[in-house]
């Protein structure tokens, strides 16, 4: 036992500390991905997408390329410094993308830190053939964007080499480089087919700064004329200017009426177009208005199927369409016929209007009021007035039957029945319609009737006050007053 275990044993152990110690062994640590209970080790599953869906990064492939081999298989070296030490320059490095330049510049900076006595053994292994700087051609001028990345680094970019190298490449290295180039070309073709199908014209014609990258990738396959027509439909303005829109407008109503004659109409339109290619004289404004009217008529028939049109009318409309195409002199006459037919259809479809006369008949009211007043005073006079009023009622009813509806006649009969059912004992003053009738009478007649009524009423009251049971006999007749 160690000293730590002795220290722990010497202290008094409580039951709570023992429980915590036992539980701490079973708890997983932060570094472990699974608890101690999981004895079986399982490999974690990593989801990966399909490779052709993603655009691959070609920088890794360019980094793995054999250094110093160009497309023709020749080895190129060039040097800028006047020192006798050779400088290794790959022939394809001038056309590499800028991202690859950054990778190579970082590698060179890392190599400079190792000191001047370090030997470039990796370069010897990857590119075993070098030429002297005097025999190598000068770097091409006029391409600032394609200059090597170490041109600004000065003498630190030169690498001292140990020993003499061979002047010819081996056959195995040449075959391996050819195989790699073939695989790279096949993969580029696959990428252009499956991934880069929707390449815009700007991407196909890049700027002058990216000409090196385009030269490296090689010429892309140009879209043929058939593939270009399969995309979006393109209409040039020259074709639209050559079309005659008037003839197209003429053919539209005919296509809606009958679809079978579309081929013959198109042939007729093409024949007229060939004849009048230089100058096309469009129809007048009247013909266009007539065609619009016919089109509206056909659309209204489709929207309102309840209108039943005979076969003769349909034939007439077809004949009108043919006449509009053949001759334009009868346009005004045909438009009038169309307007007349539209008006006749409106008149047929609209129902007749019904008028109800609910006015009160007032001429018979004053006569009835006079008959009620006279019936209170004497039976003979009341009978004569009732006969006169009864004779006036049928005259009014016969006059009203001519110019009134059934509802108004029923209302008038009901009003007459109610007036006939009123008891004769009620006076004109107490009756509900007495005040209205008196207000409507003339001023002269109303004053004389009031005077007579007041005199009769005063005499009747005097007789009742005297207690004469035969007071009614003292009342004079209507003729004696």
UniProtKB/Swiss-Prot annotation:
Keyword RNA-binding appears in the UniProt entry: no
Segments of skewed composition (Basic residues) = 177-188
Region: Disordered; residue ranges are 70-91, 131-233, 306-397, 415-454
One GO-annotated biological process of the protein: outer dynein arm assembly
GO terms assigned for molecular function: dynein complex binding
Q: Name the InterPro entries for this protein.
A: DNAAF8
Sorted UniProt keywords: Cytoplasm, Phosphoprotein
Question: One Gene Ontology cellular component annotation?
Answer: dynein axonemal particle
Question: Where in or outside the cell?
Answer: Dynein axonemal particle; Cytoplasm
Residue spans of biased composition, Basic and acidic residues class: 163-176, 310-322, 337-349, 359-380
Hey, what's the signal peptide range on this chain?
Answer: none
Q: Which residues carry this modification: Phosphoserine?
A: 83, 145, 147, 328
Keyword Lipid biosynthesis listed? The answer is no
**Function recorded in the entry:** In cyliated cells, dynein axonemal particle-specific protein required for deployment of ODA to the axoneme. Interacts with outer dynein arm (ODA) subunits.
Q: What name does this protein carry? A: Dynein axonemal assembly factor 8
Q: Which organism is it from?
A: Rattus norvegicus
Gene giving rise to this polypeptide: Dnaaf8
């Amino acid at each position: 036992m160690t000293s730590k275990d002795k220290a722990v044993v010497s202290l008094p152990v409580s039951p709570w500390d023992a429980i915590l110690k036992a539980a701490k062994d079973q708890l997983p640590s932060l570094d472990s991905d699974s608890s101690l209970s999981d004895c079986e080790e399982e490999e974690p599953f990593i989801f990966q997408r399909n490779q052709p869906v993603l655009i691959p990064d070609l920088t890794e492939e360019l980094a793995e390329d054999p250094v110093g081999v160009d497309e023709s298989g020749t080895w190129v070296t060039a040097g800028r410094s006047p020192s006798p030490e050779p400088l290794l320059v790959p022939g394809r490095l001038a056309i590499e993308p800028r991202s690859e330049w950054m990778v190579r510049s970082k590698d060179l900076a890392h190599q400079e830190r190792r000191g001047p006595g370090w030997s470039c053994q990796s370069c010897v292994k990857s590119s075993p053939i070098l030429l002297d700087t005097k025999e190598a051609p000068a770097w091409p001028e006029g391409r600032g964007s394609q200059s090597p990345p170490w041109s600004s680094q000065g003498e630190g970019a030169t690498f001292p080499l140990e020993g003499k190298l061979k002047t010819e490449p081996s056959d195995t290295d040449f075959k391996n480089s050819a195989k790699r180039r073939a695989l790279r070309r096949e993969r580029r073709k696959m990428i252009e087919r499956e991934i880069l199908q929707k390449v815009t014209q700007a991407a196909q014609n890049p700027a002058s700064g990216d000409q090196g990258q385009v030269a490296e990738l090689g010429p892309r396959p140009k879209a043929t004329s058939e593939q270009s027509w399969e995309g979006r439909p393109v209409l040039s303005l020259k074709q639209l200017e050559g079309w005659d829109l008037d003839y197209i407008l003429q053919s539209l109503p005919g296509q809606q009426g009958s679809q079978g004659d579309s081929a013959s109409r198109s042939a007729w339109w093409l024949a007229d177009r060939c004849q009048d290619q230089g100058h096309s004289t469009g129809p007048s404004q009247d013909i266009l208005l007539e065609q619009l009217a016919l089109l509206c008529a056909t659309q209204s028939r489709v929207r309102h199927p309840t209108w039943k049109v005979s076969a003769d009318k349909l034939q007439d409309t077809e004949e009108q369409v043919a006449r509009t195409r053949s001759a334009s002199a009868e346009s005004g006459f045909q438009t009038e016929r169309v307007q007349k037919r539209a008006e006749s259809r409106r008149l047929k479809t609209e129902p007749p209007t019904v008028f109800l006369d609910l006015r009160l008949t007032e001429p018979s009211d004053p006569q009835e009021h006079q008959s009620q007043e006279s019936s209170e005073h004497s039976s003979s006079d009341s009978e004569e007035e009732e006969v006169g009023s009864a004779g006036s009622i049928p005259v009014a009813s016969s006059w009203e039957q001519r110019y009134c509806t059934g509802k108004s006649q029923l209302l008038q009969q009901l009003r007459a029945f109610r007036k006939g059912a009123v008891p004769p004992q009620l006076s004109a003053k107490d009756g509900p319609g007495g005040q209205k009738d008196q207000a409507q009478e003339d001023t002269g007649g109303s004053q004389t009737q009031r005077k007579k009524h007041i005199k009769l009423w005063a005499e009747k009251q005097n007789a009742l006050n005297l207690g004469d049971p035969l007071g009614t006999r003292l009342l004079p007749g209507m003729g004696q007053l």
